[in-house]
A protein has these predicted regions:
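Catalytic palm subdomain of template-directed nucleic-acid polymerases
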Residues: 28-50, 128
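Short, conserved phosphate-binding/catalytic loop or strand-edge motifs used
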Residues: 24-30, 67-72
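Generic non-transmembrane alpha-helical segments
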Residues: 5, 9-13, 48-57, 123, ...
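DNA-contacting surface of Y-family translesion DNA polymerases
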Residues: 112, 120-186
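Long, highly charged, low-complexity intrinsically disordered interaction regions
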Residues: 45, 49-111
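Residues that scaffold, gate, or flank divalent-cation-dependent active/transport sites
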Residues: 1-24, 28, 165-167
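Flexible, glycine/proline-enriched loop segments at strand-loop-helix junctions
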Residues: 33-40, 90, 104-112, 120-126, ...
């Protein structure tokens, strides 16, 4: 019930093609094209939407603002937890690639990061890597050094590519990519 109500509030601000429902209580929005329309910064637009949700449902929200979907997710899941809530309990965190590296490259535990579970963490720890900064530094190691991109690919196969991207705060997938995806038919 509340999930539908909240989604309908989002639709007042953003078209469905610019939203990706990630879970029952989590939505990604690409608001890039809306900032000029509403004459708002990303923070101001997030606060407007959150205040609308709060006034209509009584539910307080947290928002993560980022330059890509990964940074939005990390801003919400990791960074927002360290921000004091406002008078309504709202927390909004903002990350770009530089602030991510500055604030979170040394963050522990590494399992706080999207798509890094206990299995990945254990493999990384066995090779002396405990943070996203460690992964990023490993990815640029020279060929003749132990810590280099090849080590990550040996440990994680093709999944190393996304792990390396995320270590640097990069995310190649966009909401438009998700919306345009068509699964292959057998």
């Amino acid at each position: 019930k509340y999930s539908t109500m909240i989604y309908n509030i989002y639709l007042k601000y953003v078209a469905p093609e610019d939203m990706h429902v990630y879970s029952i209580d989590e939505v990604f929005m690409d608001v890039t094209d809306y900032l000029g329309i509403y004459h708002k910064t990303p923070y101001e637009l997030a606060m407007t939407i959150i205040q609308d949700v709060l006034s209509q449902t009584g539910i307080t929200a947290t928002a993560g603002i980022g330059t890509n979907m990964y940074l939005c997710k990390i801003a919400m899941d990791v960074e927002a937890k360290h921000i004091a809530p406002d008078k309504d309990g709202v927390r909004i965190a903002i990350l770009d690639e530089q602030s991510y590296r500055r604030k979170l490259w040394d963050h522990r535990p590494i399992t706080d990061f999207w798509r890094v579970g206990r299995g990945y963490a254990k493999k990384l720890e066995e090779h002396g890597m405990y943070t996203m900064g460690d992964i990023a530094r490993c990815s640029i190691g020279r060929e003749d050094e132990y810590y280099n991109e090849d080590l990550l690919y040996r440990l994680f196969g093709i999944n190393a590519e996304l792990l390396i991207d995320h270590a640097w705060g990069w995310e190649p997938c966009t909401i438009a990519d998700i919306k345009s995806y068509k699964p292959e038919r057998n």
